[in-house]
From Swiss-Prot:
Keywords: ATP-binding, Covalent protein-DNA linkage, DNA replication, DNA-binding, Endonuclease, Helicase, Host nucleus, Hydrolase, Metal-binding, Multifunctional enzyme, Nuclease, Nucleotide-binding, Nucleotidyltransferase, Repressor, Transferase. A motif (RCR-1) lies at residues 18-21. GO terms for cellular component: host cell nucleus. Its EC number is 2.7.7.-, 3.1.21.-. Its cofactor is Mg(2+); Mn(2+). Its main location: host cell. It comes from Maize streak virus genotype A (isolate Kenya) (MSV). This is Replication-associated protein.
């Protein structure tokens, strides 16, 4: 994200495409037909699909596609079929890719005529080829082309480059996350909606509408919300029920930051232990963070509000300098809870005996 490579838009341009669908039980024949139809404009000449099994028994699908004109796409989900998302690679050596796909297939389907490419070692004897030791670049290129998941990618590196694996594991984990990103599942809110029982609901509703529920101009800047009050009053459950969010408790971990979140929650973290508090409270854009076990990266492409939740004994405002407090008050709606207030409605009382007797 902070690196230049991660800011580049996805792009694939090649007449030979190698696709890997991890955890995909799709029938190879059906997959072939669907992929073939996707690339009609580039005049498909050949496709091979094979279904294989991981060691854990789960299924994955490999596909080699050859077209007359180079496939040119900028949408990383162009080759998605029935909800399955592939790793998209250029097949630099179609002969090797085809051999790899056909090594241990459970089911295979082909369409068209395979177009072989000349071997890069053409003209050399077998002994010369065997004596040539592959470079690290060649080993990594082979691993990138043939791995089907994060686990397999790291396992192949550990096997082929054990010293590099043991000394540079965090960099390989970073590249594994880039090659095999987690597909965001459709958000299902596990926290039921609640109606706060407050003395001043209006101030909260006035904050919710423009900052959470209403879409706004990307150039506009949101405003954060600070809630301080007793424990066991439903603050966290209410805050988490509003929609997709980044949630931090005890510490702020940027490694799993979700750009698609609508807002952030800082829950029960003392002021002195909240890094980038100004950027979060001020709903700033495009600031740099430093994850504990990763590279620095740029986050928050658009302005996002932050809900800060604190108990009375760790009130942020008591820890701030006058200058910090001035910034905080300018960028935050502050709600200090009164005795008896809750962030959920009180349960309905059961009918009295008198009501029962009247109905009878």
């Amino acid at each position: 994200m902070a690196s230049s490579s991660s800011n580049r838009q996805f792009s694939h341009r090649n007449a030979n495409t190698f696709l890997t669908y991890p955890k995909c039980p799709e029938n190879p024949e059906i997959a072939c037909q669907m992929i073939w139809e996707l690339v009609v404009r580039w005049i498909p000449k050949y496709i091979l699909c094979a279904r294989e099994a991981h060691k854990d028994g789960s299924l994955h699908l490999h596909a080699l596609l050859q077209t007359e004109k180079p496939v040119r796409i900028s949408d990383s989900r162009f080759f998605d079929i029935n909800g399955f998302h592939p790793n998209i690679q250029s097949a630099k050596s179609v002969n090797r890719v085809r051999d790899y796909i056909l090594k241990e297939p459970l089911a295979v389907f082909e369409r068209g005529t395979f177009i072989p490419r000349k071997s890069p070692f053409l003209g050399k004897s077998d002994s010369e080829v065997k004596e040539k030791k592959p470079s690290k670049d060649e080993i990594m290129r082979d691993i990138i082309s043939h791995s089907t998941s994060k686990e397999e990618y790291l396992s192949m590196i550990q096997k082929e480059l054990p010293f590099d694996w043991s000394t540079k594991l965090q960099y390989f984990e970073y590249s594994a996350n880039k090659l095999f990103p987690e597909i965001q599942e459709e958000f299902t809110n596990p926290h039921p909606p609640s109606s706060p029982d407050l003395l001043c609901n209006e101030s909260i509703n006035d904050w919710l509408q423009p900052n959470i529920f209403q879409s706004s101009d990307e150039r506009s800047r949101k405003q954060s919300l600070y809630i301080v009050g007793p424990t066991r009053t439903g603050k966290s459950t209410w805050a988490r029920s509003l929609g997709v969010h980044n949630y931090w408790q005890n510490n702020v971990d940027w490694s799993s930051y979700n750009e698609d979140a609508i807002y952030n929650i800082v829950d029960d973290i003392p002021f002195k232990f909240c890094p980038c508090w100004k950027q979060l409270v001020g709903c700033q854009r495009d600031f740099i963070v430093n994850p504990k076990y990763g590279k620095k990266k740029k986050v928050q492409k658009k302005s996002k509000p932050t809900i800060i939740l604190a108990n009375s004994d760790e009130d942020w405002m008591k820890e701030m300098t006058p200058g910090q407090l001035e910034y905080f008050e300018a960028n935050c709606i502050i709600y200090i809870m009164s005795p008896g207030e809750k962030w959920y409605s009180p349960p309905e009382l059961p009918p009295t005996e008198a009501v029962h007797s009247d109905r009878s």
